[in-house]
Structure formats: C-alpha cells, structure tokens
C-alpha cells in the first residue's frame, strides 16, 4: 500500500472547499489525482459525475488506465462489489479528457442552442485551416480596397513595406490568435482603442495614471533598493571611498527628485527633464594606495553605476524619447489606427467563421468559443446547458491548471455550481511554459495567493520530490533560489518553491553528482557566428557524445525502479534536452558519425532544413530570377554545384548590376564555366515557362524530376527523412490549390508566413530504434517525462526577442503600435509599455522552461553550454548575486540574454561547486578548454583550484567545410527580400568601389539577408595575434568610448582606464596585450581631442540612432526606388561647438606607409558613405545644430582625415 505524505493525504481526502494543489516537479500529482478519484468512487460517487480535465490526450488516456487499474485492484479485494464493476466499465466513457474534447461534447449535445448544424466536422488539418483564414483575409482586403477606404489604406501603409502587405496581414493574423482565447472577444477588441485615449495633458490620462506611472515608480524604487542594499556594505564607510559615496549621494538625490516628480504628477516635460538630470556628477578614480577591500568595493560601485545608467537609458528610450506634444500626437494617430484594426479584425473573424460554416467545419478555437456561448446563452429554457452540467458534475478536477487561458477559465466557471465548492485544481506555477498558447499563469497565481484565506478555499503545497536523487534536488534548489522570486515569477522559490528530497529509495552509493560542462568558444569563431547565427556549437555536441561514451565505458550504474536493482546504463536511459529543435539535424549528424543510437521525439525544424530551403529558393527564382540571394544559394547548392571561385569569376566579368545579369553575360563565354551557366539558365527558363501553364504542385514535381532532387537528398545523411520532407511540400502545394488559391508568389508568401508564425509542417521523424537509443527532445516535449541521466544543452543560446522588435506588440491587455512618421518610426507609449511587460513575462517563462528541463533528471543532471570569452563571463558572474539576500537582482534577470545569465552567477559561487577536470577530457581531441563542474554537498566542500585543459583545436578550415555541408540553419533562408532593418556596420561596405570588392569576399547573414565582408588587411599592430582584427578593433573602440577626459592627461591615465575596463568585465584581460596603446595615446593627446579635455560635457560617444534610407542606395536588386530601409547604427562620437557638430569615427584599417597617400584615399572613399549616413542621422536627431565637419580617425596611421 502506498504511503502518502501529510500534504498528499490532504489533497486526496479534503472536500467541501475549492482546492488548489501546488505540486512541484516529481511530487506525484497524477498519483494523488487518481487516488482522489478512487476515494470518490469508493464513497459511492459514480465516475460519470466527475469532470476531469487534462492538458493532453495522452494524459487523459494515462489517467483512464490508472483509474481502471486502481478499480481493478479494489475489485480483487471486493469481488462481489457490483458498483465497482459498473464503474470499471464506465471509465472509458467518463468525462476524462482535454478541455477541447469536453467542449466538443458540449457542442454535440447542445448544438441547437447556438443554431449549429449537427453534421459539422472538426477541421484538424492545420494547413487547410490556415488557407481558409488566408482566404478570409484576402476577401476583406478586397472589400476595403473596393470601397477605397483611406483609413484601411493608412493602416496597411503603416505596417507594410513598399513591396508587400505582409506586416499588416501578420498583425491581423496574430491578433486573431489572441482574441479567440478571450471569453468576450468583441469586448476585448472594443477596449483596445481606449488605451490610447488622451488629452493634451498626458499626465492626466488613464494610460499614464494606471499603467505607466505605477510601472516607473516601481522601477525607480527597485533601483533605490539596489543602491540602498549596496550601501549597507560597511566598507562604504571607509575614508578611501568618501568621494565615491559623495558621487552616489548626488545621484540618489537626483533619482529621488525624479521619483518625486513622478509621484507628484509634475508635467510630462518636467518629469522628462528630471530624468535627463539623473546622472553621476563625476567619474571617480581609484587609487593604488587604497586597501584591497576598498578596491574591490570600488569595482562593485562602478559596476552598479554602469547598471543604473543603463536602466535609466532604457526608461528614457521607452517613455521619454520625445516631448509631450509629440507623444500625444503619436497616441492620437495610434488610436485612429487601432480603431481601423479592430474593425478589420472583426470582419476577419466573421468572414473566417462564414467560410467554415459554408463547409460545415469547426476548428479548435471554435470548440471553446461555441461551448462557452452554449453554456452562457440565455435560452427559453434558461441556461439549459449550464444547468445540465452543474447538476451532472459533483466535482471538477483540473490538471495542469497553470496553463489554462482566459476562455477556458470562464468555461470552467460556467459549469461550477454557485455556492458549491467543488473545484479541485492541480498545477505548478514553476512549470507554466505555454505562453505561446495564450496560457495565463496569473490565474493560478491569483488563487495561489488568495486560497486558504477563508473557509471556502484551501491551498495545499506538494513539495516532496519522489523522482530525483538528493544531489539533483539540491542542484535545482541551489540554482533556482536566486532566480524565482515574488517580483520575478510570482513566487518566492526559497521560501515556498523548493524541492524536498523524498526519493529515499535510491541506494546511497549511486553515482549522482550533477555536472556542468563549459566549452569555451574560441574568439576566432565570432565571424562564423555572424554568418550562421546563434546555433549550437559543434563542440557542445561532441562533449555530450564523449561524456556518453565515457559513462558507458566506466559501466555507470543506474537504479532500476522496476527490479529494485542497480544495472549498467543503457542508451535509452539518457535524454538530451534542448530549448528548441533547430539543432536536431546537427545533433543527429554528429551522433551518426559517432555511431551512437539516437531517437528524436520532436519533428525537426521543417522550414530550416537544407532541402526545404533549397527548393523554396528555386521557387523564388522561378517567380523572379532578378534576386541575388536565392540565385547564389541555388547555384551553390548540390543541384548545380557552383564553387565560390566560379561565382567570383562570374562577378568579376560583370561588376555592376545584379548577379542574374552577370550570369547571363557569362553564359556567352566559350568555356566550361560558360556552358555551366548556359545549362542552368536554360533549365530555369524552361521551368519558368512550365510554371506559367501548370499548377504549383506540378511545378514542384517537375523540379524534383529534372534535378533528381529526391535522389540527391536520399543519398545524404538522414536521406529518407529528407525525401519525406520534400514530398510533404508537394502535398501542401496540392492542398493550397485545392482550397482555390493560385499563383506562385502567393504560395511562397503563404509558406513564408507559416514559417515566421512557427506553423511547422514537419513530418514525424522516421526511426525504428526508439527503445534502444538516446532520446533527443525539446524541453516542452519532455514535460511530464523523467530519465535517469539528462543532458540539458544549448544553455549559451541567446533568447529570441523578435516579438519585441517588430512594429506591434500584442499583450493580454492591449495592442501596442509603432507609428511610421515621414522620416522615422517611433513606438507609441502603449507599445513601449507592452514591450516592457512582455519582456519580463517572456523571461519569467524562460526561467520556468529551464526549471522544467532540469527537473527531468532522476539520477544525474548534466548541464552543457558553449561560451565565448569564458574568463570575462566568470568575472562578471562573480559579483552578480546579492551577497546579503543571495538573490539575483531583478535588474539582472530582466536583462538576461540566455539561460547562462540565470545560472552562471550561482554556478560561479565556488563554495557550492567542486570544480575539477576529469579524464573525460582525454577523449576530446578537438576542444580548447573544458570547464567541468561537479555539484558537491555543502558539508563536503573542499577548496580546490580550477584546472584547465588545453587540447588540440579543431581545424577551423575543416570546421567550416563540415558546417557548410551539414548546417541546416541555411545561410540564405530569407531570400526574397532584404530585411527592413540594417545596421550601419553591416551596410557600410556596400559603399565600397565595386573594383575593390570581390564576390568571394562577400557574405550574407541568414537571419536577415544583410551584407557583410571580412575586415580588410590587418594593421601591423593587430597581426599574428590570438584575436581577430575585428575583435581588437572593437576593443580599441571600447577604450576610447570610456576614456575619461576629466582625469590626468598622462599615459598612466590610459593604463588606469584599461585596467578599470577589465575589472568591470567590459574588456577581456587577454585582449590587453594586443591593444595598440601608442595609437590610443596618440589620439587622446592629439590636437583634435584637445577640446575634449576642455569641455568634456560637450563630447558625446556611442550615440545610437535610427534613420530611413532609400533601399536602392544599398542594394542593387531593389527595383522600387521608393523602398526604404530603417538603418540602425552607433556613432563613435561627436563634439558640440558653438557653430555646430563635429562628427568623427575611429578606424583601425591598415595603412600602407610606403603608399600612404593612396592608402588613406582608398580608406576615405570606403567610409564616405557610412559617414554620410551618420551625418544624415545626426542632423535628424539634433534640433538646433547641424553637422559642420566629418572626420575619420585612422589609428594605424595616426591621422585625422576630413571627409566631404
């Protein structure tokens, strides 16, 4: 007989109240649910009178099986109990299902209440659903255009580019996904414009008083708390630091003035001015005479100062970038647009519904909406459906309650009888990870904090973990104590969320040490990452493979709970868990090479696969061959095998114009390459003619036949899967045309929209070795599962924040818009507010996702990350956790860029982790550094030095070849158009003279189709070093960015500046020997910089800007001369004089001293376009003064060069 804990017994036996069970990972919540159901049945309650809602169909099936087993076990004890026998038969037809299945039952039973045809079918084909939605959107677009509706045109103009209407369409489609989870979507939509209602006095508006003001007050008070906690350090009373303290006193006084202006409702412009005054008066220098303690405290004060400045800059950028009059104008424009959007969204919902009804279809969102309407509709029989279910169900049990949305919450409330406390909810706020499905964890939190305060409700916390060894639970607790707090995640993990070790059945001699493996990315990989994005580093996969091999070789023992015996580790005991599935194919490839069995439970990232990118690029070419990026991608693909030297040869012959023209020109050359070009162009032209008279599906199949593409991909690794993927695209094209759609361009746009909206069309991965292989899955797919050994990979991956960088943000409360003005775009205050709130919500969910991943481990947890600049990261982490509270400050958490930003600070606390390097590193011949950390129980800690193992480095050339062949995050994924956003650092090379630029030296970034070229010849002082020229150049910029022109005008000052940057973690200490201090000192002592010393307050450095530039100035293949691109960049510096602004930019380009004049002239031409961009931007953002001079600071040549 199972022995339950006190809290589990409460969850099983307590009745008469609405009960919320907060069940941590591995706490046996399913067991408790099943036991509670059995107790109800044994007390005479039929299973048909219970409603049990699960999150997935698989969970519902498991629940039914476990209930049947429990009843069967009881029947063995009471063989004559006929009631139990009848209940055993009733379980299969009982209401144990997902919320969708329950809603479907409501609709089938009471369809007549909403006048629905009972012969409806459920629309399960996602592609068909998307196509119907596309048709609905297309029809309402036609309706607006036929009416020549100017408001609608203004809406489309604001959110779409000059070439298409995708921006506006995406807004409407994404808004649809949100509103259909609202219980009253019309009310939700009608309320959206209200956020923008404002009079001329912004401070009096509801938006300011109820939304922005409370947020800003909270943020400022959080900053004040950080300062106050820092000054609790007794060391701050040290006489050494008196000037530091005085500097902070001035700053805190200014911060208090800003807070008072906020709280006292000063005018917007006064509050803005007060914020602009919130800055530190001086840059206090340290002294070598200070004690070691004072120097350490000083460094901490400098880091805090930097953080405070950064946070205030964000507040300014979000809420005070323009003055009140302009803010009000933006809000009024936004309100008008939102009203148009609301009108269009209502039409879209209505028309989409009509199209479904015409085919007698309902989709999943209809199920919940229709069920809610049925349950709340006042018919002649007065809520007949609602009363039926209220009388039918004695109790409503809900699993995974943390993941319900607003509509589901209202459905549950509708079937709960008033005055009857019969609601039983089980969930864990720490495992709410479905925000993309509109899950509302705040609904769980509101009950969590309210239940138990009266006699009608009860809160039960299940914290005992029966899944994991003590080492695993200690690891998880140690890592999450600093992360999840009341102001981040809604729960104080240290007090209320910790796992309690309950799995006492494990033998004490099992190997259970948690491990953390760093692979230190080499600096030389930086340029590669620019091309291929933030994908998983190969070394991570190799580390995991090596560790798995070692575990097998050393006969690692696992505890088998079925046999209650130890046994050797099997591959199927191991799970590799990642945040996304984008790296699946790469992992599969490496495992295949290592001859290790691997089963992938998630479908791969379909749209990013090599074969899909290849065929989509070919379709883009057939639609329009005048596109350089897809053209080069197809030429380089295995279909045609053009090599880079061949492409360069083609470009050299025709240096101007697009690449298609160059290819056409070269086809006339009498050579093997000319014939190769001719053959390609003939096939392309033949396919274009074929496309004009045939269906899209026929075109796709014709490409397969003419290029033998199916045969080619079948011969590649994982070839059968690739073939299935290509056949799937053919099937989708057939479905597209069957739905009445036509046109190749439209089909490409449809597929692209599905890709961006993550509507993956992937086919299940083919495998027959699931039971004998290592499992690879995403964290989402792993939820609810457990494995003896778990590797959590990709912890260095950057979080995706694209949703916050677009032109609109949809939140649970509103719709934030970016407004297009004549020469720029600007976020409305509603957009800025939504971005701030959504960013924190996103990061809170990322922390919860991390928790889910780590708690899958039963016996051994291994965390894996590849990290660049490891030493600098470690130095940064050392001081991040507040030493008094042992909490990671909120400011750090809301600025987290990756999981490592959450975990690193705690991992760096050496008193909790035993840091060793073991002999596993001998199996890794291709790594440079490995940080291998074992978790140690507090009482077992011994001080040990961290060891580092320098081994042979992977050949960069071979690495590039392998990655090019098997990199499935294809570098030309967005081939039909460039991004609407470019950085100056990326486009500056476009201004180069074509004679100076060979195609073979050009690169294109996959994420946004941006131009990049490698740095030109390296200056003398940068040569033959560990770091690349670009990296050293960046470091030189960094020193000049922070150089203090109020200090001593000596070389010692420069040394102190560099030392301070290292101590702040801004500059890698290994970089220091490679800096050209002579060049740096030349500039700061130069005649040009003399005025900086006299008037340092007039010097502005690292000034960011955004500016609209004609796309045709940057890209040859932009046929639309009116097309514009938003360019974002950072100006190295400018200086204010009485006459105007002096603009300057540092360059570390090599200058050939033997031909200095010609070399400087070449560099000048190279960067003239860039500086003109800067000039344009600076003139736009400067109200009173214009640029009167532009200069290049050539550090290698020690020259200041004027630019026209």
From Swiss-Prot:
It comes from the Bacteria. Residues 2-469 form the UvrD-like helicase ATP-binding domain. Gene3D superfamilies: 3.90.320.10, P-loop containing nucleotide triphosphate hydrolases. Keywords: ATP-binding, DNA damage, DNA repair, DNA-binding, Exonuclease, Helicase, Hydrolase, Isomerase, Nuclease, Nucleotide-binding. One of its GO terms (cellular component) is DNA helicase complex. Its cofactor is Mg(2+). InterPro entries: AddA, DNA_helicase_UvrD-like_C, DNA_helicase_UvrD/REP, P-loop_NTPase, PDDEXK-like_dom_sf, PDDEXK_AddAB-type, Restrct_endonuc-II-like, UvrD-like_ATP-bd. The keyword Cell inner membrane does not apply. ATP binds at residues 23-30. Pfam families: PDDEXK_1, UvrD-helicase, UvrD_C. One of its GO terms (biological process) is double-strand break repair via homologous recombination. Residues 496-784 form the UvrD-like helicase C-terminal domain. Its EC number is 3.1.-.-, 5.6.2.4. It catalyses: Couples ATP hydrolysis with the unwinding of duplex DNA by translocating in the 3'-5' direction; ATP + H2O = ADP + phosphate + H(+). GO terms for molecular function: 3'-5' DNA helicase activity; 3'-5' exonuclease activity; ATP binding; ATP hydrolysis activity; double-stranded DNA binding. The heterodimer acts as both an ATP-dependent DNA helicase and an ATP-dependent, dual-direction single-stranded exonuclease. Recognizes the chi site generating a DNA molecule suitable for the initiation of homologous recombination. The AddA nuclease domain is required for chi fragment generation; this subunit has the helicase and 3' -> 5' nuclease activities. Belongs to the helicase family. AddA subfamily. Heterodimer of AddA and AddB/RexB. This is ATP-dependent helicase/nuclease subunit A.
